[in-house]
């Protein structure tokens, strides 16, 4: 499929051919869900923890004798039924990350990119298009791409002045090509890829 290549003013400066193997994949919501759930699980800190009976400080003595008190028998004041006692089967420190097949991860990225193309929310930017020096310039530049709520720009590298110009814009995120992922693509309304990024993605995803 052929799409327009635009500059930072959203003026057409050329054409680029997009591989249907990467940007023309059928929508698979189940794959998107699997990949997003996997990403969110990896982000969890896993620092939740409650005290089990060995963690609770206090005496280990039996509170009162076993029989002839008229009360239920007890063996420890640190038991879960007492105030300040332990928690049974509570959360512990652990990693929530799990493995997901590489082919599923690649397919999820293809589906997310294809969905943006089908919704006309993917813009291919000329490699020399990111010439921004001030936040005011960046605000005007992204306004040229329409009334989208948020923008994700993916390029191979960024100059420091471009990053400084965009970091104060709450609806614009810059991402390097190596870090492109399904969750960030779905969280942003408009995805802007440079021509170089498109070629890198096709060479990376067409083989798997």
From Swiss-Prot:
**What GO CC terms are in its UniProt record?**
ribonucleoprotein complex; ribosome
GO biological-process terms attached to the record: translation
- Molecular function GO labels: rRNA binding; structural constituent of ribosome
**Keywords linked to the UniProt accession:** Ribonucleoprotein, Ribosomal protein, RNA-binding, rRNA-binding
Tell whether Lyase is among the UniProt keywords. no
Q: Which Pfam families match?
A: Ribosomal_L4
* Xref: InterPro entries: Ribosomal_uL4, Ribosomal_uL4-like, Ribosomal_uL4_dom_sf
**PANTHER family the UniProt entry points to:** 50S RIBOSOMAL PROTEIN L4, LARGE RIBOSOMAL SUBUNIT PROTEIN UL4M
* Quaternary context: Part of the 50S ribosomal subunit.
What HAMAP family does this protein map onto? Ribosomal_uL4_B
Function, as annotated? One of the primary rRNA binding proteins, this protein initially binds near the 5'-end of the 23S rRNA. It is important during the early stages of 50S assembly. It makes multiple contacts with different domains of the 23S rRNA in the assembled 50S subunit and ribosome. Forms part of the polypeptide exit tunnel.
The name under which this protein is listed is: Large ribosomal subunit protein uL4
* Species annotation: Anaplasma marginale (strain Florida)
């Amino acid at each position: 499929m052929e799409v327009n290549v635009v500059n930072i003013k959203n003026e057409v400066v050329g054409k680029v051919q997009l591989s249907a193997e990467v940007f023309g994949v059928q929508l698979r919501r189940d794959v998107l869900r699997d990949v997003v759930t996997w990403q969110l699980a990896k982000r969890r800190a896993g620092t939740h923890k409650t005290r089990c009976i060995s963690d609770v400080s206090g005496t280990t003595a039996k509170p009162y004798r076993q029989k002839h008190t008229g009360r239920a028998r007890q063996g420890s004041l640190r038991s879960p039924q007492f105030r300040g006692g332990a928690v049974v089967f509570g959360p512990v420190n652990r990693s929530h990350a799990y493995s997901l097949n590489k082919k599923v991860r690649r397919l999820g990225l293809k589906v997310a990119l294809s969905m943006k193309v089908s919704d006309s929310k993917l813009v291919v930017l000329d490699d020399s298009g990111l010439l921004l020096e001030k936040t005011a310039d960046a605000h005007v530049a992204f306004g040229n791409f329409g009334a989208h709520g948020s923008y994700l720009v993916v390029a191979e590298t960024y100059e420091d002045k471009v990053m400084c110009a965009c970091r104060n814009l709450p609806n614009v995120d810059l991402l390097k090509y190596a870090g492109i992922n399904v969750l960030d693509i779905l969280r942003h309304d408009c995805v802007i890829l440079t021509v170089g990024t498109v070629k890198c993605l096709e060479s990376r995803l067409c083989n798997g």
